[in-house]
Amino acid sequence: LLEKAILDRKEKTGKYPKAIIPVALYGMPYDCEKIMAIADKYGIPVIEDAAEGMGSRFNGQVLGTFGRFGVLSFNGNKMITTSGGGALICRNDEDANNVMWHATQARDAYPYYQHTEIGYNYRMSNVCAGIGRGQMTVLDDHIAHHKHVQSLYEELLKDIPGIHIHKQPADP
């Protein structure tokens, strides 16, 4: 279906998509190998939306680390929260430096404020970053708790017809 959509866009517009953005809803991994193979075939970068998939894995590899970029969210309803904000995973220093430069207002290295490009103010506060770093140390505990709650639901609802609990693809 993905490849069909790419070819359809190319036929209709003469252009390939600028990016492929797979989304890990409810911690459920997408098929990273298939998506990356198709993306590589057409030279399209992958930006993984792992906001709901933090800590989830596909064949042992953490979501957000397959594509050119991975995006995490630290909103209040996520596995780890800083009350807002997020993180960007970059595969190389050049991309990381470019993103940081734009996220910190694209200010040029002069003693006065000079901007040769439009930048943004997307920095997380030091306090929020500290909260996030502290919570990273207990990410595995949060994941284990969620799996425990899932197993409770499975046990309590197993005899009710029509109810199916989704399992992580990596789970047996």
Task: Please report, for each region that a protein language model flagged, where it lies by residue.
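Conserved PLP phosphate-binding loop immediately N-terminal to the Schiff-base lysine helix
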Residues: 1, 19-35, 44-73, 79
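PLP-dependent aminotransferase class I/II
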Residues: 3-15, 19-23, 28, 32-34, ...
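Solvent-exposed, non-transmembrane amphipathic alpha-helical segments
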Residues: 46, 83, 90-91, 115, ...
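Active-site PLP attachment segment
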Residues: 65-103, 126-131
